[in-house]
Amino acid sequence: MNKKIKIPKDSKAINYKTTDLIREFISDRGKIIPQRITKSTRKKHKLIEKAIKQARLIGLMPFKQKNW
């Protein structure tokens, strides 16, 4: 679970369109990985959470993983 995730310094790079980036912040079961594990700041983690939730609502990402 302790995988190294590279967080971009530019906060504009974190949005719902960058699904490749925000998929790294989701666990195998489809849950958002906590801030203490990803080592991201509070501000960046809020942006990541918001982007994941927006992508799920639009349909770019699934709410649950299929194999669970």
Curated annotation (Swiss-Prot):
Record-level Gene Ontology MF annotations: small ribosomal subunit rRNA binding; structural constituent of ribosome
Cited HAMAP family: Ribosomal_bS18 (MF_00270)
Key words of the record: Chloroplast, Plastid, Ribonucleoprotein, Ribosomal protein, RNA-binding, rRNA-binding
UniProt name for this protein: Small ribosomal subunit protein bS18c
Subcellular location, principal: plastid
Family: Belongs to the bacterial ribosomal protein bS18 family.
InterPro entries (alphabetical): Ribosomal_bS18, Ribosomal_bS18_CS, Ribosomal_bS18_sf
Coiled coil keyword on record: no
Location relative to the cell: Plastid, Chloroplast
One Pfam family in the UniProt entry: Ribosomal_S18
PANTHER family: 30S RIBOSOMAL PROTEIN S18, SMALL RIBOSOMAL SUBUNIT PROTEIN BS18M
Database matches in SUPFAM superfamilies: Ribosomal protein S18 (SSF46911)
GO biological process assignments: translation
Keyword ATP-binding included in the entry's annotation: no
One GO location term (cellular component): chloroplast
Origin superkingdom: Eukaryota
Assembly description: Part of the 30S ribosomal subunit.
